[in-house]
Amino acid sequence: MSRSKRDNNFYSVEIGDSTFTVLKRYQNLKPIGSGAQGIVCAAYDAILERNVAIKKLSRPFQNQTHAKRAYRELVLMKCVNHKNIIGLLNVFTPQKSLEEFQDVYIVMELMDANLCQVIQMELDHERMSYLLYQMLCGIKHLHSAGIIHRDLKPSNIVVKSDCTLKILDFGLARTAGTSFMMTPYVVTRYYRAPEVILGMGYKENVDLWSVGCIMGEMVCHKILFPGRDYIDQWNKVIEQLGTPCPEFMKKLQPTVRTYVENRPKYAGYSFEKLFPDVLFPADSEHNKLKASQARDLLSKMLVIDASKRISVDEALQHPYINVWYDPSEAEAPPPKIPDKQLDEREHTIEEWKELIYKEVMDLEERTKNGVIRGQPSPLGAAVINGSQHPSSSSSVNDVSSMSTDPTLASDTDSSLEAAAGPLGCCR
């Protein structure tokens, strides 16, 4: 594309302290969140005739870590295509050459709210179960490609008013290696698994602890383990769940083991005490979902010893979840990631910049006339299986009144105010 023609395709608008220079197809930009990794705006796509979210990466070439994170996010979003993972619609840059290249814009599906708002609602069993089912389907799809999300938290999970749920933000995702020697400083503290807190290394079911924390928060309407730092976080966990057994202690590094063994010993509480029936909604007559089933699932996810924690496949088959089971969702073909050494790559900033520029140019070429060519639409229609999903006629728990503003809250702090409201049909 010639320089003059490229210039004519873009316009600039001030968003807070930042300037968004976007393709003219994107109109009516409105800020909806900001954070360490970038600023997110809602916009209207005149070509696709739909609302979208545009994320401007924050200084992607500031250092090698930022550059590597940006490259990883682009590669993973391009490869992953599942109804419970946020869909990539477009990627572009207003710069005209590699030498000028400095800004990356990622266009994604726009959702109605993040899970932080939904957690404050009184959900019935159908809606809670269905939201968790979708979460697990998205996680399994990532795990099937060896991708550990590591950053699951309510603000990284978004929903629409029809109860559709999607996982987002892959800037901190990592492909699973053989050594599992991974940095523990990743997940928002409250949702960190014990193996992360204790620097033990981790495998895929580190994400199941995070789901357990989120589910517990949906039940209790409060954070389960609100630690101020790693030490306080560990103390909060063992005070409630109990000090782990000696076999677990043997797995710890010597210095960590010494500290943990010298802490006061806690018996912990039963899950009936932590999550009494009074916190749960009434048992479901239609799908036979009960508080006892929900509590049993929590007890299998919130397990300190990862070797005894439930896997995503086991969670999907749990009685509280499997009423929604659909092979097309839970057993979708794994994404094909061409760069098998995605997380082992080490480059200079300039080398990362060139790699990212090539990715952006490739995606620009593939999205000239709409969504990415060669990739199925991320907005696949919901498949209704044998189990009836929460009825659209139900006025109980409808998220449509939760907020008038949409959101796509990746690593950003959503600007939306949580508002009480009913949560609508789930499928």
UniProtKB/Swiss-Prot annotation:
Dually phosphorylated on Thr-183 and Tyr-185 by MAP2K7 and MAP2K4, which activates the enzyme. Phosphorylated by TAOK2. May be phosphorylated at Thr-183 and Tyr-185 by MAP3K1/MEKK1. Phosphorylated form is more concentrated at synapses than none-phosphorylated. A motif (TXY) lies at residues 183-185. Pfam families: Pkinase. Residues 26-321 form the Protein kinase domain. ATP binds at I32, G33, S34, G35, A36, Q37, G38, I39, V40, K55. SMART domains: S_TKc. Activated by threonine and tyrosine phosphorylation by either of two dual specificity kinases, MAP2K4 and MAP2K7. Inhibited by dual specificity phosphatases, such as DUSP1. Inhibited by SERPINB3. Gene3D superfamilies: Phosphorylase Kinase, domain 1, Transferase(Phosphotransferase) domain 1. Changing G171S: In a renal clear cell carcinoma sample; somatic mutation. One of its GO terms (cellular component) is basal dendrite. The active site is at D151 (proton acceptor). GO terms for molecular function: ATP binding; enzyme binding; histone deacetylase binding; histone deacetylase regulator activity; JUN kinase activity; protein phosphatase binding; protein serine kinase activity; protein serine/threonine kinase activity. GO terms for biological process: cellular response to amino acid starvation; cellular response to lipopolysaccharide; cellular response to mechanical stimulus; cellular response to oxidative stress; cellular response to reactive oxygen species; cellular senescence; energy homeostasis; Fc-epsilon receptor signaling pathway. Keywords: ATP-binding, Biological rhythms, Cytoplasm, Kinase, Nucleotide-binding, Nucleus, Phosphoprotein, S-nitrosylation, Serine/threonine-protein kinase, Synapse, Transferase. The modification Phosphoserine is found at S377. InterPro entries: Kinase-like_dom_sf, MAP_kinase, MAP_kinase_CS, MAPK_JNK, Prot_kinase_dom, Ser/Thr_kinase_AS. The modification S-nitrosocysteine is found at C116. Its EC number is 2.7.11.24. The modification Phosphothreonine is found at T183. Its cofactor is Mg(2+). Residues 371-427 are annotated as: Disordered. Residues 404-415 have a biased composition (Polar residues). The TXY motif contains the threonine and tyrosine residues whose phosphorylation activates the MAP kinases. Forms a complex with MAPK8IP1 and ARHGEF28. Found in a complex with SH3RF1, RAC1, MAP3K11/MLK3, MAP2K7/MKK7 and MAPK8IP1/JIP1. Found in a complex with SH3RF1, RAC2, MAP3K7/TAK1, MAP2K7/MKK7, MAPK8IP1/JIP1 and MAPK9/JNK2. Binds to at least four scaffolding proteins, MAPK8IP1/JIP-1, MAPK8IP2/JIP-2, MAPK8IP3/JIP-3/JSAP1 and SPAG9/MAPK8IP4/JIP-4. These proteins also bind other components of the JNK signaling pathway. Interacts with TP53 and WWOX. Interacts with JAMP. This is Mitogen-activated protein kinase 8. It comes from Homo sapiens.
